[in-house]
């Protein structure tokens, strides 16, 4: 190993109780992630033990230069798979010095919804299928694709194996293990229909933790692709033409849905979602109209449709759920670049709190 590698992998706990905390927050675009580190005197297990911090919001598009300070509040802690030991990753949300959430802080409102007693009683579970595309850095073109050209048509790549079908698996597996190490409820990975595109799943996670875990999983993936020299894209339709887009299908259930007779509650919830289709679409990610065309396993963006085992529907119910008379459903509308705080809390709000 090189000296640099040796130093990167130093085990601090051999010589000190001090730990490094990497504070993570969402930047001005609402999708970009930012982070910086600080030294703490000793191990920490609860976010309430961590100090608030600040950053220059004028450099992230979140504050004017003459009043640039943005305050970040620690909200959840994960083990750091990069520094390891007692070092931690800290997901934060952002506020003005007066304590008001800034516009890109979608966690604040989500936390309000998830703390509502009616929502708490239903214990909403989420499983989010995060699709993404790996791009060659210099040409902004999917890995495994000839520069300026195209691979063979879709068909052999979904869950494919082999040097001519799976591109970037080392990144995918590194991310998988890093998420398990961090304490994220990552439940699986698979190659997607378009070559160079992959998916990981986070969940089941309850309430606000689904958003926290997905954002940290995205951060870890961004860090790994940084090391690999590959660009990570959450564009919902990275390549025009006869290629699948990238989504973030969101699986959802409440306690009532999971109990005997829950299928009736599932159908009732789907009817509510249909009545607020436009509002949900508006909040489900930028550029989603390029993906939701009615082709490539999607429903048309202007049409609300649900069905059993129908991957061309807005909402899909699994055959196992129909057979058992209880379970969960899948909202297939969210784009890969959606904010999980927005999507998860909006589904809970519509299905539990909203009265048509």
Curated annotation (Swiss-Prot):
One of its GO terms (molecular function) is ATP binding. Roots. One of its GO terms (cellular component) is cytoplasm. It is found in: Cytoplasm. The keyword Transferase does not apply. Gene3D superfamilies: Glutamine synthetase, N-terminal domain, Glutamine synthetase/guanido kinase, catalytic domain. Residues 41-64 are annotated as: Disordered. Pfam families: Gln-synt_C (PF00120). PROSITE patterns: GLNA_1 (PS00180), GLNA_ATP (PS00181), GS_BETA_GRASP (PS51986), GS_CATALYTIC (PS51987). InterPro entries: Gln_synt_N, Gln_synt_N_sf, Gln_synth/guanido_kin_cat_dom, Gln_synth_cat_dom, Gln_synth_gly_rich_site, Gln_synth_N_conserv_site, Glutamine_Synthetase. Homooctamer. This is Glutamine synthetase PR-1. It comes from Phaseolus vulgaris (Kidney bean).
